[in-house]
Amino acid sequence: TLVMMNFLYGLLINIAVLFLQIVAVFNKRIKKFFENRKNIFIKISNQINSKDKHIWIHAASLGEYELAVPLIINLKKKYDYKIILTFFSESGFKLKERINEVDYTFYLPIDTKSNCRSFIKLINPYFSIFIKSEIWPNYITELIRNGSKFYLVEGSFKKNDWYFSFFNVFIKNKLKKFNKIFVQDKNSLDVLEKNNIKNVEVSGSLKFDRVKYQLTLNNKVEKIDKLLKNKRVI
Protein backbone atom coordinates (compact mmCIF):
# COMPACT_ATOMS: atom_id res chain seq x y z
CA THR A 1 0.00 0.00 0.00
CA LEU A 2 2.76 2.46 0.96
CA VAL A 3 4.74 1.67 -2.19
CA MET A 4 1.62 2.35 -4.26
CA MET A 5 0.90 5.57 -2.34
CA ASN A 6 4.48 6.78 -2.87
CA PHE A 7 4.17 6.03 -6.58
CA LEU A 8 0.77 7.74 -6.78
CA TYR A 9 2.02 10.83 -4.94
CA GLY A 10 5.07 11.11 -7.21
CA LEU A 11 2.85 10.73 -10.27
CA LEU A 12 0.38 13.36 -9.05
CA ILE A 13 3.16 15.84 -8.28
CA ASN A 14 4.62 15.48 -11.77
CA ILE A 15 1.20 15.81 -13.40
CA ALA A 16 0.47 18.89 -11.26
CA VAL A 17 3.77 20.50 -12.29
CA LEU A 18 3.06 19.85 -15.97
CA PHE A 19 -0.48 21.21 -15.65
CA LEU A 20 0.66 24.34 -13.80
CA GLN A 21 3.37 25.01 -16.38
CA ILE A 22 0.63 25.11 -19.02
CA VAL A 23 -1.57 27.33 -16.85
CA ALA A 24 1.44 29.62 -16.25
CA VAL A 25 1.20 30.77 -19.87
CA PHE A 26 -2.06 32.52 -18.94
CA ASN A 27 -1.56 33.18 -15.23
CA LYS A 28 1.06 35.71 -14.11
CA ARG A 29 1.14 34.50 -10.52
CA ILE A 30 1.86 30.89 -11.44
CA LYS A 31 4.33 32.03 -14.08
CA LYS A 32 6.17 33.97 -11.37
CA PHE A 33 6.18 30.83 -9.18
CA PHE A 34 8.17 28.93 -11.82
CA GLU A 35 10.38 31.91 -12.71
CA ASN A 36 11.40 32.18 -9.05
CA ARG A 37 12.65 28.61 -9.17
CA LYS A 38 14.41 28.82 -12.53
CA ASN A 39 18.05 27.62 -12.29
CA ILE A 40 17.54 27.23 -8.53
CA PHE A 41 20.24 24.57 -8.16
CA ILE A 42 22.79 26.71 -9.99
CA LYS A 43 21.94 29.61 -7.67
CA ILE A 44 22.35 27.42 -4.61
CA SER A 45 25.64 25.85 -5.71
CA ASN A 46 27.05 29.31 -6.56
CA GLN A 47 26.29 30.65 -3.09
CA ILE A 48 26.93 27.88 -0.58
CA ASN A 49 30.22 26.24 0.30
CA SER A 50 29.92 22.46 0.12
CA LYS A 51 32.62 22.16 2.81
CA ASP A 52 30.44 23.96 5.36
CA LYS A 53 28.02 22.15 7.63
CA HIS A 54 24.43 23.25 7.16
CA ILE A 55 21.18 23.36 9.09
CA TRP A 56 18.15 23.58 6.82
CA ILE A 57 15.01 25.40 8.00
CA HIS A 58 11.89 25.50 5.86
CA ALA A 59 8.93 27.86 6.31
CA ALA A 60 5.93 28.29 4.04
CA SER A 61 5.95 32.08 4.27
CA LEU A 62 7.16 35.06 6.29
CA GLY A 63 4.70 34.43 9.13
CA GLU A 64 6.06 30.96 9.83
CA TYR A 65 9.64 32.24 9.64
CA GLU A 66 8.89 35.02 12.15
CA LEU A 67 7.70 32.38 14.62
CA ALA A 68 11.00 30.55 14.31
CA VAL A 69 13.35 33.52 14.81
CA PRO A 70 14.14 32.82 18.52
CA LEU A 71 14.75 29.16 17.66
CA ILE A 72 17.10 30.13 14.83
CA ILE A 73 19.04 32.51 17.09
CA ASN A 74 19.50 29.72 19.65
CA LEU A 75 20.69 27.35 16.93
CA LYS A 76 23.26 29.92 15.81
CA LYS A 77 24.57 30.13 19.37
CA LYS A 78 24.75 26.37 19.78
CA TYR A 79 26.10 25.31 16.37
CA ASP A 80 28.86 26.81 14.27
CA TYR A 81 26.96 25.83 11.13
CA LYS A 82 25.55 27.81 8.23
CA ILE A 83 21.76 28.09 8.27
CA ILE A 84 19.88 27.69 5.01
CA LEU A 85 16.31 29.02 4.97
CA THR A 86 13.80 28.10 2.28
CA PHE A 87 10.39 29.58 1.57
CA PHE A 88 7.54 28.13 -0.44
CA SER A 89 5.81 31.46 -1.03
CA GLU A 90 7.06 34.76 -2.38
CA SER A 91 5.97 36.74 0.70
CA GLY A 92 8.94 35.57 2.72
CA PHE A 93 11.57 35.58 0.03
CA LYS A 94 10.77 39.14 -1.10
CA LEU A 95 11.81 40.42 2.32
CA LYS A 96 14.99 38.37 2.56
CA GLU A 97 17.11 41.53 2.84
CA ARG A 98 15.49 42.03 6.27
CA ILE A 99 16.39 38.52 7.37
CA ASN A 100 19.68 38.66 9.24
CA GLU A 101 19.39 35.50 11.32
CA VAL A 102 20.26 33.05 8.52
CA ASP A 103 23.14 32.71 6.08
CA TYR A 104 21.28 31.81 2.89
CA THR A 105 17.70 32.18 1.67
CA PHE A 106 16.24 30.28 -1.28
CA TYR A 107 12.91 29.22 -2.72
CA LEU A 108 12.01 25.60 -1.99
CA PRO A 109 12.28 23.51 -5.16
CA ILE A 110 9.04 21.68 -5.96
CA ASP A 111 8.64 18.36 -4.13
CA THR A 112 9.50 16.04 -7.03
CA LYS A 113 11.88 13.13 -6.49
CA SER A 114 14.57 14.56 -8.76
CA ASN A 115 14.37 18.03 -7.19
CA CYS A 116 14.55 16.63 -3.67
CA ARG A 117 17.53 14.46 -4.49
CA SER A 118 19.41 17.36 -6.10
CA PHE A 119 18.60 19.77 -3.26
CA ILE A 120 19.55 17.45 -0.39
CA LYS A 121 22.72 16.37 -2.19
CA LEU A 122 23.71 20.04 -2.62
CA ILE A 123 23.13 21.26 0.92
CA ASN A 124 23.71 17.94 2.78
CA PRO A 125 22.01 19.19 5.98
CA TYR A 126 23.29 18.16 9.41
CA PHE A 127 19.63 18.31 10.40
CA SER A 128 16.46 19.96 9.10
CA ILE A 129 13.51 21.76 10.67
CA PHE A 130 10.09 22.19 9.10
CA ILE A 131 7.81 24.89 10.51
CA LYS A 132 4.16 24.23 11.32
CA SER A 133 2.38 22.27 8.54
CA GLU A 134 5.17 21.92 5.99
CA ILE A 135 5.15 18.18 5.35
CA TRP A 136 6.70 17.30 1.99
CA PRO A 137 6.78 13.51 1.39
CA ASN A 138 9.58 13.36 -1.18
CA TYR A 139 11.83 15.60 0.92
CA ILE A 140 11.20 13.34 3.91
CA THR A 141 12.13 10.28 1.84
CA GLU A 142 15.32 11.93 0.61
CA LEU A 143 16.37 13.11 4.08
CA ILE A 144 16.02 9.52 5.31
CA ARG A 145 18.10 8.32 2.36
CA ASN A 146 20.70 10.94 3.25
CA GLY A 147 20.83 9.80 6.88
CA SER A 148 19.90 13.28 8.09
CA LYS A 149 17.70 13.98 11.12
CA PHE A 150 14.63 16.16 10.65
CA TYR A 151 12.04 17.74 12.94
CA LEU A 152 8.64 19.43 12.77
CA VAL A 153 8.09 22.39 15.11
CA GLU A 154 4.95 24.42 15.94
CA GLY A 155 2.84 21.46 14.80
CA SER A 156 -0.94 21.74 15.14
CA PHE A 157 -3.22 18.82 14.31
CA LYS A 158 -6.99 18.23 14.41
CA LYS A 159 -8.81 14.94 13.99
CA ASN A 160 -10.47 16.09 10.75
CA ASP A 161 -7.23 17.34 9.12
CA TRP A 162 -6.65 16.26 5.53
CA TYR A 163 -3.55 14.39 6.68
CA PHE A 164 -5.83 11.73 8.11
CA SER A 165 -8.29 11.44 5.22
CA PHE A 166 -7.59 10.12 1.71
CA PHE A 167 -3.81 9.84 2.14
CA ASN A 168 -4.25 8.57 5.72
CA VAL A 169 -1.76 5.69 5.69
CA PHE A 170 0.70 7.54 3.46
CA ILE A 171 0.86 10.75 5.53
CA LYS A 172 0.86 8.92 8.86
CA ASN A 173 3.85 6.93 7.66
CA LYS A 174 5.70 10.15 6.76
CA LEU A 175 4.87 11.74 10.12
CA LYS A 176 6.28 8.70 11.90
CA LYS A 177 9.59 9.26 10.12
CA PHE A 178 10.27 12.61 11.83
CA ASN A 179 12.87 12.29 14.57
CA LYS A 180 10.57 14.42 16.71
CA ILE A 181 7.36 16.39 16.20
CA PHE A 182 6.97 19.36 18.55
CA VAL A 183 3.30 20.36 18.85
CA GLN A 184 1.59 23.43 20.26
CA ASP A 185 -0.89 21.72 22.58
CA LYS A 186 -2.09 18.48 24.15
CA ASN A 187 -4.98 18.25 21.69
CA SER A 188 -2.47 17.89 18.84
CA LEU A 189 -0.57 15.30 20.87
CA ASP A 190 -3.77 13.30 21.44
CA VAL A 191 -4.69 13.40 17.74
CA LEU A 192 -1.28 12.08 16.70
CA GLU A 193 -1.17 9.41 19.41
CA LYS A 194 -4.63 8.16 18.36
CA ASN A 195 -3.12 7.73 14.90
CA ASN A 196 -0.28 5.71 16.45
CA ILE A 197 2.27 8.49 15.95
CA LYS A 198 4.43 8.44 19.09
CA ASN A 199 7.43 10.63 18.23
CA VAL A 200 5.64 13.69 19.64
CA GLU A 201 6.30 16.24 22.38
CA VAL A 202 4.23 19.22 23.54
CA SER A 203 6.48 22.28 23.43
CA GLY A 204 3.92 25.09 23.38
CA SER A 205 3.73 27.82 20.79
CA LEU A 206 6.75 29.61 19.38
CA LYS A 207 4.62 32.78 19.34
CA PHE A 208 5.39 33.37 23.03
CA ASP A 209 9.13 32.99 22.45
CA ARG A 210 8.84 35.43 19.56
CA VAL A 211 7.09 38.02 21.74
CA LYS A 212 9.71 37.64 24.51
CA TYR A 213 12.49 38.06 21.97
CA GLN A 214 10.84 41.12 20.40
CA LEU A 215 10.65 42.79 23.82
CA THR A 216 14.44 42.55 24.16
CA LEU A 217 14.91 44.65 21.01
CA ASN A 218 14.80 48.39 20.48
CA ASN A 219 11.19 48.77 19.34
CA LYS A 220 11.16 52.53 19.11
CA VAL A 221 10.14 54.11 15.82
CA GLU A 222 11.83 57.51 15.55
CA LYS A 223 9.17 59.17 13.37
CA ILE A 224 6.36 58.11 15.72
CA ASP A 225 8.32 59.23 18.80
CA LYS A 226 8.81 62.68 17.27
CA LEU A 227 5.14 62.91 16.34
CA LEU A 228 3.86 61.95 19.79
CA LYS A 229 6.43 63.87 21.88
CA ASN A 230 5.57 61.90 25.06
CA LYS A 231 1.85 62.71 24.76
CA ARG A 232 -0.75 60.28 26.05
CA VAL A 233 -2.26 58.23 23.26
CA ILE A 234 -5.56 56.36 23.08
Where do the PLM segments sit?
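Low-complexity, intrinsically disordered, cysteine-poor segments enriched in small/polar
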Residues: 7-14, 18-21, 25
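ALDH superfamily catalytic-core signature
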Residues: 212-230
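Short, Lys/Arg-enriched N-terminal segments with co-localized hydrophobic residues
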Residues: 1-4
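Charged active-site motifs of nucleotide-sugar-dependent glycosyltransferases
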Residues: 51-56, 225-234
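Active-site and donor-binding regions of nucleotide-sugar-utilizing enzymes
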Residues: 21, 25-44, 48-217
